[in-house]
Structure formats: structure tokens, C-alpha cells
Amino acid sequence: MKDKSIKVLEFNKIQEILKNYTCTKAAKDIIEDLKPYDSVYEVREHLEEAKEAFKLLITKGAPPFEGVYDIRNGIYLAEKGSALLPGQLLKIAAVLRCARRFKEYINHKEEEESYRVLENICEGIFSLPKIEEEIFNAIEGEDEIADRASSTLYNIRRSLKEKNYSVRDKINSLVRSYSSYLQENIYTVRGDRYVLPVKAEHKGAVPGLVHDQSSTGATLFIEPMSLVNLNNEIKELMLKEKAEIERILTVLSAKINANITGVKTDANIVWELDFIFAKAKFASEYNCTCPTINNEGIVDIIEGRHPLIDRREVVPISVKLGEEFTSLMITGPNTGGKTVTLKTVGLIHLMAMSGLMIPARENSVISYFNNVFADIGDEQSIEQSLSTFSSHMKNIVEIMDKADENSLVLFDELGAGTDPTEGAALAISILENLRKRGTKIIATTHYSELKAYALRKEGVENASVEFDVETLRPTYRLLIGIPGKSNAFEISKRLGLPDYIIDFARENISNENIRFEELIENLQEKSIKAQEDARLAENLKLERDKEKKKYEEKLEGLQKVRDNALIDARREAKNIIKEAKEEADKILKDIRQLERMGYSSDARRKLEEERKKLKDKLDSIEEKEIKTVHKGEALKNVKEGDEVLLASINQKVIVLSKPDNKGDVLVQAGIMKITANIKDLRAAKGSNFNSSSSKIKKSKKLNLNLRRVESSVDLRGMDAEEAIYTVDKYLDEAYLGGLGEVTIVHGKGTGVLRKTIMDMLKGHSHVKRHRLGEYGEGGTGVTVVELK
């Protein structure tokens, strides 16, 4: 890729913007070296990593880059075997922590979306939590080692603290004793030793060692002899503390050295991730998308925006190239946006090929080119000097030497700077030669000859930048398929040039040129009208989709209401059954108590009375439930305009169509139109219909088994097989009948039948627990079973 083209297209400015989103100098250095990759595969992988990082920013928020540093110098020193400073060790630990946390950050549950490229990068992370923990435990700040760094350091500092307390007590006592000889009644420290500020004239009154004097010489700082030993002990402890700190730093540095490969790898991955997430943050800020990449020369940029132009002012452009045509000629007025179009296309390609998402709409297509050549400068006129023409021609010569079918060439005002006739002929020759090579070309021009060349040559297409003659301002919109019209006469007239001069100028133009310009004007008007119609259609489609989504959400809400109603109904029915079973169980327990007391006949009569009450109660609830759910009469036919009840959602609706052969009708519920079957329609209250029946049909019934089930079963006289069958059938009936506890009579005998029944009950689905009968219940001759 040509460095000159990269510079002309201002890719370096994108790099500078990108650097603002990084956390480390190392990531900035990666961006500094960023350029288009060498293959389509690399481009796709680096775009995918940016896309994945973009998704992670949205779904999981900012990545764990807190406290990430550039630790290259620390790694270098550790690798050489040097002892690192506390701050250097802390920064290395912070990077190791970031690498470990990032592995956790990117982790996802099985059902969540995976991040293939980023996960592959993170696979290389060593994770060194032990070293990380040791450093953070030992070092508290840039120049502060924690007491817990070692037991030796802890003991030294404790002794040092005690000695300092002792010497302060001693020197405070001396301050009071020598107060008349001191400049101030305080003590101070000189060279890590406690001293007194003694007046120079009284130096003999305070025996000791002179360590310093004031700038005026009026004060001597004397260490009293009684403190010398204590100060010596403090000094020794301080030296021991320093030696222990150096030992701790050496040990920690050695551990970094021993794991230098893991540390370097983790650091490099963190810096790479810093760079990748800078790309994602840039994409988020500039509303970028991930394009589709091909190597077939096909370009389809949808509403691309130049990222260096103010986002409030930039006008999106859409450019196609490579399928229907391989060369695009852009014509139009000066300052109309032709050069910006070239730069936008070129810069977007450089960004995509460097793994950056692009400022364009979704589904944009970018081709991978081996080279992007750009001959772009200030817009030129025919009065340009030979030197300027020569400068352009020098670039063109180089392009002609290297461009091939895998190249994109951008020409700004091709052929300008010389005689128009010669310039146009030269431009056509250059374009035709490159076209035959298969080179993809976008060129801007003023020459009518190039418009005509594009009209007649297959594979070459005209385009123009739109100009508003009313306001005398360009709109910067690109119109593909329409050559640019010269607006010199219209602009001159609006600026006040007399009509007779303009008319005379028109007379000097051939009829053929006039007709050509009129044709272009007509095409432009039709194209603009077509684009306006397309935009209107797109807006209508968006509004329709929005309304559709709103109705679908309302329908979903209604369905949820219906589902919740059904759930509530089922829950209520379940509660009714539960209450019924609890009431029946209570009655049975009371009856069993009565039976044990010898009141069997009365108990049975009471049981039947209670069961009848319970059945009547449930029938009443069931009838009430049925009447509540489906009001209205069943319908056989409906007509347009009828108001009916849609039973499934229990809501009144208006019939909009007659039933089809399947019985489906279109109805309106509020603002929604729904297709329903006539079987789901009922006569709404207050509506007159001829129905087949005026009776309320029960569509839902509480299916409770209220037939009488005995509270015990007698197995005496049966063999094992018959007994098992009888008990199984009986337990089903008892369970459906809502009994909570039953008795199985098997007799005492040899105990074989009892054992058979006990074994069967252990795995039975209806049995909660079972036991042998107690005294008064039949003893070991019966088994009492509690049902679920």
C-alpha cells in the first residue's frame, strides 16, 4: 500500500483519533503502526474482533482495563535479573490482574452468544494469580511496603516503633530538664537521630554530639549522650528494615523473572485487547458498522460518511462499483463535494482493510485491494502552471506502472492543468488503459468529453454531485447514472450578469452541446424525482413496520392477559380441589376416631352427609365458574358489522368479513384486526342473533371424582397376585376420590400377604407413607396408608 496515498487520504488522522480511546502507550504504539493487512482473511478476522468487542461493550459494559499500564521497562529489567521498584511491581501485578479479569469478562453462559476471535486471543492468557496476590499483599503503594510482606519486616517495624516510643519519652524528659538552654521547648530529627535545638552560648550545658547548626549559627542541634545508644539501636533497626525491603523486592522480582514468558504474554494480550476495544469505542462514537469483505472488486458503500467532517454537517453518500461497471466518472461544480466523495471512498477502504469498522450503514460491501492509489490535490483550473500539471503527471506515471486488476485508483480532476482538448484526450487514454487491465477507477472531471466517454463505453458509468441552482449551493449528494450538468449560465444569471451577455454566450455553443446539456438536465430532474419517491416509499415502509410492530406488541399483550387468566383459573381450580381433599381428610379422621370408639353406623351416616355437602358445594362453584368464563350464545353464522364476543380473550369484537370455507373470519378488537374461527365466537350481551340453542354450553368442567369410595379394602382370602391387583385399583380410586388415608385389611395369618402388600406400597405413585395398624385399628392385621 502506497504511503503517499495513505497520507493523502488522511488515514493518519484516524489513527490519532483512535489513540484517544486507548489506556496504554503500548496500544498507542500498535495504532501508530496500523496499516491495511496483507490478506482478506486477516481483514475479516480483525473486523470480526472489532465487531465482537463492539457487542461486548453494549452487552457487558466497559472492559476491566482499570489500572492498566505500559510495563515494558519493568519486564525488560526483570528479564535482565534486576530488582524492580515497588511501583514497577505494582504495575506488573495490575496488568496480570487485568488479564485474569478479562478472561472472566469474556466468559459466557452456554446459551449466550460466543465471541470466537476474542476467546481465541484470551486462550493465550497464562493467569498468574499467585504472583499477582503476593505483589498486592506485599506492596501498598509506589514507595510503600506493607508490614505483612514478611514476618521479619513485621517484627523489625514493631521493634522500631517501640524504640521510637522509648526515645521520644526520654527526649521529652530532657526537653523539660534543659528548657532554659533551648531555643524552643521541642525536639527534632537530624540524620535519623533525635536531637535538641540548643542555644549556641549554652552548648556546654548539654553534653552530647553536635549534628547540625542553624543558618545563623545561633542554634546547635545536639544529640544528648543519654540518647546515643537508643538512637544507635533505631538506626540499626532502620538499616535492617531497608535490607529486608530490598530482599522482598528481590524475591518478587525473581518470581517475575521465573515467569517472564507468562508475564510478557499476558501483557501483550492486554495491550492487544486495549487496541481492539479502542476500535470498538471508536465505532460506537462514530456510528460505524462492520462491512462485508470480498476480493472480487465489488464495492457497495451505503450512506458512507467521511469521519473527519463534522457529523452534524456531513452528507452521506452511496457508491457502487465493480458489478455493473468498473469505472465511475463524477462530474459537477467546484466545491460540490467531488473530492470529498473520492476521499470518503478511499478512506473507508483503508479503514476496513485495517480492521476498523466503517462509518456507513449495515450491509455495506468493501473490496480488498492490494493497492489504493490516490492522485488527489487542490481542485485545478486550465490556468494551472506546468509545474502543477507535472506533479500530477508524476503520480499518474507511477500509478500506470503499478496498478492492476486488484487496485483501486482515485483520480481528482484527471487531465486538468493543461489544454482542455489535450487534457481530455489524455484522460480518456489513461482511463481506457486502466479499464482494460481490470483496475477499479473513480475519477472526477470537468470535461464534457469524459461524460460522453462514460455514456458510450461499456463498464463505465457517469455520476454527478447535485447542485441547487435556486440557492447557488451544492447539496453534496451523489447521483449515480447521471452526468453532471454545467451550471455556469444559471449561476452567472443569478449573480447578476446581464442577459445579453449570457444570450451571446449561448449562441457560441453548438446545438449539439445545448441538446446534450438539456438531456442531462432532464435526466437529473427525473433522477431526483425518482430518489424522492424512493425516500418517500422507504419512509412509508418504516411507518408501516412501526405500526405493525406496535400491533404485534398489543396482540402479544392480549395473549399474555389471556394466558394469565387461564393460569389463574387453573390455580383456582387446584385450590378448590386441595381444599376439598383437606376437608375430606378431616372428615375421614373424625370418622376413624368414631369407629375406634364403637360408633360405626353413626359415623358412616355422618360421612355420607358431609360428602353430600362437599359435592353440592363443588357443583355450585363449578356452575359459577362456567357462567363466568363464557357468556353469550354459541353462533352458527355471522355477518359483517356484527358485534360478538371472542371467547378466547373474553373481549367484544366487530366482524369485518364473512366466514370462509374453514370458518375463519376477520374481526377487529380495538385497533387490531385478528383472524378468528366462528367456533370461538359467542353472542355478545345485548346483540340479537338466531342461535341454534339458547342454553349455555359448558366448555370447561371441573372433573372431580365424587363417587363413593370406601375407606378400606379387605384382601383376606385372596392370593398375592389378586391382592396386588385389587390394592392397585383401589388406591387409584381412593386417590381420584380425594381420600387422604385408607386402610388395607390383610389379616395376620403367616404374614406373607402383609409382606407382599408392604413391598408393593413402597414404590406406589399414590402412596406418601404407610404403617401397620395400631391398637384399636386392627393391629398387624391391617396396613394404614396415607395418600399424596
UniProtKB/Swiss-Prot annotation:
Alphabetical UniProt keywords: ATP-binding, DNA-binding, Endonuclease, Hydrolase, Nuclease, Nucleotide-binding, RNA-binding, rRNA-binding
Keyword Hydrolase: yes
Signal peptide: none
Enzyme class label: hydrolase
InterPro entries the record matches: DNA_mismatch_repair_MutS_C, DNA_mismatch_repair_MutS_core, DNA_mismatch_repair_MutS_sf, MSSS, MutS, MutS2, P-loop_NTPase, Smr_dom
GO MF annotation: an example: rRNA binding
PROSITE patterns, per database record: DNA_MISMATCH_REPAIR_2, SMR
Enzyme Commission number(s) from the entry: 3.1.-.-, 3.6.4.-
Positions of disulphide bridges: none
Limits of the Smr domain: 713-788
PANTHER family: OS10G0509000 PROTEIN, OS10G0509000 PROTEIN-RELATED
General function of this protein: Endonuclease that is involved in the suppression of homologous recombination and thus may have a key role in the control of bacterial genetic diversity.
Subunit (UniProt): Homodimer. Binds to stalled ribosomes, contacting rRNA.
Similarity comment: family membership: Belongs to the DNA mismatch repair MutS family. MutS2 subfamily.
Name of the protein: Endonuclease MutS2
Organism name: Clostridium botulinum (strain Langeland / NCTC 10281 / Type F)
